[in-house]
Amino acid sequence: MLEYMDYVLRQFEECTSWNKDNSYENIVGTSRNILQFDIPTALKVQVSNRATPYSYNTLELTNNKTINGSLTYLYTNCENLDQFIEGSSSVHLQQMTQSFRYIEPYYHHYKNNSKLEVPKVPELPISLAYGRMFYPSSSLEAMYIRRFPNYYQFILKCSSSKSGSSILTMYLQKNTGINCQELIFSTNEALLGYRFVHNFVSAGSKSNLSLYNNSSLSIGSEIWCALLNLSPGCSTTLRYCSHATNTGKPLIFTLSLNPLYGHVSSTYSIKTHENLTFCTKYDFNIYSIQSNLTLGMELWKNSSSIPVERPSEPVETIEDWPQLSHDKTPMYYHLLTRTENSGASSQRLLKDLNLTFQSSLQKINKERNVIENFNERYSEANFTQVFKVSTSLRDMNLRLLWEGKIRGFLISAGAELTQPPEISTNGLDSLEHQNWSLISPSKFGIQLQYSA
């Protein structure tokens, strides 16, 4: 479950047209949300409210053997952000839950299609300031975001504890839609990094059976270097997103490679229904020849109210056209001879050509409507609860999480069942000596949120 300040930050990105999915940090966000979801570790209560249209605050209490708390304050000069923020009683559950992420393809020619909207870039710099104080430890967290025109964004994060250790991290990002670049520097061991994601812009090909191309292919990479000890790090990830043309079900495939450690990881996620998602992840290490298979799913449940069915949009056919002209048929109008005697033959030729391609045009509209209707049914559904489960065959663990809305409160409860490591007589760990009957809960917690 997203915390209230994380929800405000996500809406701030949406209000300023910043695509968070177009970054290397979230290139495998879907599989991470389904397989490696966060589980509460204690009893946590959060109360949040919107003091003014530009300021938000949160009070949090946590009971884990001792009572701890935190106070959070956020301020921004972003106009109309309060219209994107909703309270816990009216917000959709899918907006507060880290779940399947729809990756919209990047279209280069915005002007050629009136239905595509150009991303709105803020004309003036927009800023956001965030601060959080923990007690009784007296630790501090701070973040400052500056959104500039021309697709630039600067982020400054700082954390300080009573022991004296402080970490400062700076991000300089440029997100143009077709690619995203990030330059990162952290005072922790003088860490310097560079990350980028590039989206391939492609048009429909003759070998593609689907006339409506709604798929996207992205490749990203990151390079790190700790300047104090000269420790390098790098990784590369490939992501492919598409939809089933007959059902509109979205699917995401990723392939990651870390050449320094010899780690290869692949994930496959598919939303088989509006309320059901499956995800698998396979890890393999080239050097140690070790592998692991992780499985996960999430199941949504909506209210008992019957959704209202939307009427399908009518498809324009040849019979609906009273007379063919250049405005109606710009594709074949240049083939006609502009003579007075050839008017009837020209009309017959245009009609024959459009009848030939009418089935293809109707197929494009049908595929597009199926995909758009599937996404709209999920985003507008009134879900009341979601159940997540994931397991790892090598780690022999079981992760459970339930999140829901009850009387205006957002509740999250979860547990992780693991097995303590068992050592054989020769001192080596072996999977065949492990027993699922010995698993016990290693993590359990409940989180309660309310916001007005």
Curated annotation (Swiss-Prot):
Q: What is the lineage of its organism?
A: Eukaryota, Fungi, Dikarya, Ascomycota, Saccharomycotina
Parts forming coiled coils: none
UniProt xrefs under HAMAP family? Mdm10
List where in the cell it is found.
Mitochondrion outer membrane
Known function: Component of the ERMES/MDM complex, which serves as a molecular tether to connect the endoplasmic reticulum and mitochondria. Components of this complex are involved in the control of mitochondrial shape and protein biogenesis and may function in phospholipid exchange. MDM10 is involved in the late assembly steps of the general translocase of the mitochondrial outer membrane (TOM complex). Functions in the TOM40-specific route of the assembly of outer membrane beta-barrel proteins, including the association of TOM40 with the receptor TOM22 and small TOM proteins.
Q: What coarse category fits the chief subcellular location reported for this protein? A: mitochondrion
The text the record gives for the protein's domains is:
Lacks alpha-helical transmembrane segments, suggesting that it resides in the membrane via beta-sheet conformations similar to those predicted for other outer membrane proteins and porin.
**Cellular component, GO annotation:** ERMES complex; SAM complex
Q: Which Pfam families match?
A: MDM10
Q: Which UniProt keywords apply?
A: Membrane, Mitochondrion, Mitochondrion outer membrane, Transmembrane, Transmembrane beta strand
Q: Which InterPro entries match?
A: Mdm10
Q: Which family does it belong to?
A: Belongs to the MDM10 family.
> Which species is listed as the source?
Kluyveromyces lactis (strain ATCC 8585 / CBS 2359 / DSM 70799 / NBRC 1267 / NRRL Y-1140 / WM37) (Yeast)
Q: How does it assemble?
A: Component of the ER-mitochondria encounter structure (ERMES) or MDM complex, composed of MMM1, MDM10, MDM12 and MDM34. Associates with the mitochondrial outer membrane sorting assembly machinery SAM(core) complex.
Membrane topology recorded in Swiss-Prot or TrEMBL: Multi-pass membrane protein
Q: Enumerate the Gene Ontology biological process terms.
A: establishment of mitochondrion localization; mitochondrial genome maintenance; mitochondrial outer membrane translocase complex assembly; mitochondrion-endoplasmic reticulum membrane tethering; phospholipid transport; protein insertion into mitochondrial outer membrane
Superkingdom of origin organism: Eukaryota
Q: What is this protein called?
A: Mitochondrial distribution and morphology protein 10
